[in-house]
Amino acid sequence: ASDVYKRQLMHRGISPKVLRYCVGSGILYQTTRGNYRNCVFVGKDENGVPRSAFQRGCQGSFRGDVAGSQKQYGFLIPAEIETCDTVEIYEAPIDAMSGATLRQYKHDAPWRSVHYLALGGLNHQPIDYFLQQHPEVKRVALCFDRDEPGRNFTKIVAKRLTERGYIVQDTPPAIGKDYNDYLLAARRLISMER
């Protein structure tokens, strides 16, 4: 029963390698209260101290911030190389994990060849904090949802970051509303080809 969240995320297409990394680095765990289990996605500060947490029900549609969360600390899967100059920014942790899984499956580069940042919604604070902490980052891929709020936020963020000198790429999911939809569709296509 303790691995319900891992099974649920694997059902959402997240690769075991990405899951192991997130659990092992303390940015993903499960809570249980009675019959309810939640995935908890953790945002840490520059010293690795947990500062924010976003919960999502393992079953059902429950989701929300943990009380006391500081929203500037997003869910981050850091690049393996500290001098990495690229970040992919997503709305939700599951989308960031989906982006990492897609990169792993494409084999075009090691899956941690970029930073993956999830905002926990459409919020500028984690972007500003991350870029302040990572002055080596020059390239930003905006991977927000393919819906009206996501597209509008992309325009606003792209303008702000371009004005600040960043190279900005608009990369909405090729299929579906978000990157998890895209991952699941890509996995179906791969399994049909086999």
Task: Briefly describe each language-model feature range.
Residues 6-34:
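Electropositive nucleic-acid engagement tracts
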Residues 15-16, 26, 68, 134, ...:
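Helix N-terminus capping/helix-initiation residues
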Residues 30-133:
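Phosphate-handling DNA/RNA-contact segment within nucleic-acid enzymes
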